[in-house]
């Protein structure tokens, strides 16, 4: 009787629905894959495209000749706002100085 009362109280609640599986994740970019101890890509070993581990000297020399993928650029850490002023109703001016000495003045209209 407890199950029937729950269905009467909450008609959209279905207690017998099997749990849904989450959608498949997209594959990681190549630079995000873990590397094994020899320095080869883990994805290459799984797909069968990696070098054999019988000759470690040729594996290390050939893997160093391959161009390595570069990760995406990151936001500079040392940029900071030196001064900000309210120049009018809904307007703010920011002065940003980069580590290289470049100074940028931004005017933001809110």
From Swiss-Prot:
Example GO BP: symbiont-mediated arrest of host cell cycle during G2/M transition
Keyword set, alphabetical order: Early protein, Host cytoplasm, Host G2/M cell cycle arrest by virus, Host nucleus, Host-virus interaction, Modulation of host cell cycle by virus, Phosphoprotein
GO cellular component, one term: host cell cytoplasm
Compositionally biased region (Low complexity): 52-67
Composition-biased stretches (Polar residues): 84-94
Keyword Phosphoprotein listed: yes
Location in or out of the cell: Host cytoplasm; Host nucleus
Region span, Disordered: 1-94
One Pfam family it belongs to: Pap_E4
PTM comment text: Phosphorylated by host ERK. The phosphorylation triggers a structural change that enhances keratin binding and protein stability.
Further comment: The major E4 form is first synthesized as an E1^E4 fusion protein from spliced E1^E4 transcripts, such that the first few amino acids of the E4 protein are derived from the N terminus of E1.
Subunit structure, as described in the record: Assembles into oligomeric complexes. Interacts with host CDK1. Interacts with host SRPK1; this interaction may favor expression of late viral transcripts. Interacts with host cytokeratin components KRT8 and KRT18.
Function (record text): Contributes to multiple aspects of the viral life cycle including viral genome amplification, suppression of suprabasal cell differentiation and egress of newly formed virions. Induces host cell cycle arrest at the G2 phase by associating with and preventing the nuclear entry of host CDK1/cyclin B1 complexes. Inhibits cellular DNA replication by preventing loading of host replication licensing proteins MCM2 and MCM7 onto chromatin. Within the cytoplasm, associates with host kinase SRPK1, a splicing factor regulator, and inhibits its activity.
Family as reported in the entry's similarity comment: Belongs to the papillomaviridae E4 protein family.
Protein name as annotated: Protein E4
Species: Human papillomavirus 29
Source organism phylogeny: Viruses, Monodnaviria, Shotokuvirae, Cossaviricota, Papovaviricetes
